[in-house]
């Protein structure tokens, strides 16, 4: 969609799906075949607002039911830290994390929530879920 707004950001984040990030490592799930949920929270997430260049602060929540592999947390921490200086919209970050985790561990179920601090009086919460077909 074309707009007459010179401040538009259409097309400026097209590279996000292919953005190079550290590998999310994994380990064998020795309880494969059992459905259990793993939840973790990144309470001090930061990235950069692509419009203002100012930092965005928020909480990232990840919840998944593993299949054959589980996320190795140190590598996930390094993966998350790689966004610290990246200009990325909230919506795209949640989608990118979800797709990268799917590539890494092929979970049975995955939910990623980006719960961002209010900016300009607006609080943003972005959620995406995946269920293995």
Curated annotation (Swiss-Prot):
It is found in: Cytoplasm. The active site is at 49 (thioimide intermediate), 56 (proton donor). InterPro entries: GTP-CH-I_C/QueF (IPR043133), NADPH_dep_7-cyano-7-deazaG_red (IPR050084), QueF (IPR029500), QueF_type1 (IPR016856). GO terms for cellular component: cytosol. Pathway: tRNA modification; tRNA-queuosine biosynthesis. Catalyzes the NADPH-dependent reduction of 7-cyano-7-deazaguanine (preQ0) to 7-aminomethyl-7-deazaguanine (preQ1). Belongs to the GTP cyclohydrolase I family. QueF type 1 subfamily. This is NADPH-dependent 7-cyano-7-deazaguanine reductase. It comes from Leptospira interrogans serogroup Icterohaemorrhagiae serovar Lai (strain 56601).
